[in-house]
UniProtKB/Swiss-Prot annotation:
GO terms for molecular function: ion channel regulator activity; toxin activity. Acts as a neurotoxin by inhibiting an ion channel. Contains 8 disulfide bonds. It comes from Iotyrris olangoensis (Sea snail). This is Turripeptide OL55. It is found in: Secreted. The cysteine framework is C-C-C-C-C-C-C-C-C-C-C-C-C-C-C-C. Expressed by the venom duct. Coiled coil: none annotated. Keywords: Disulfide bond, Ion channel impairing toxin, Neurotoxin, Secreted, Toxin.
Length: 104
């Protein structure tokens, strides 16, 4: 569902990237990371429904800190893997995961 603010969304969802999505640690189950707010991944555990609990968002007061040196905080405030790094999570904005590495 499209949105411009969280009040446009059904209860329990959050407006992220103009879409109503499941917030971090939200009650709703997810199928893929695209069901979760930007920077949060969907995790499956022992065949249970997916949960939005893998947090790749930048940390700190200014939301500009990434603890993994292979990642950097991009303009979406997501800790994305840098060019040439193995994509164990999202690549930084502008890169895609190809052949297990983040590339332009």
């Amino acid at each position: 569902q499209a949105c411009s603010e969280t009040s446009d969304c059904l209860e329990g969802l959050e407006c992220s990237g103009n879409q109503c999505l499941i917030p971090y640690d939200g009650d709703d189950s997810c199928v893929t990371g695209f069901d979760c707010v930007i920077g949060v991944g969907c995790v499956y555990d022992n065949g249970n429904p997916g949960r939005c609990i893998r947090d790749h968002r930048c940390k700190g007061d200014k939301k500009d800190i990434c603890t993994n040196p292979a990642t950097e905080c991009d303009e979406d405030k997501v800790c994305g893997y840098k060019e040439g790094e193995t994509c164990y999570g999202p690549c930084r904005k502008g890169l895609t995961c190809r052949n297990t590495r983040c590339q332009k």
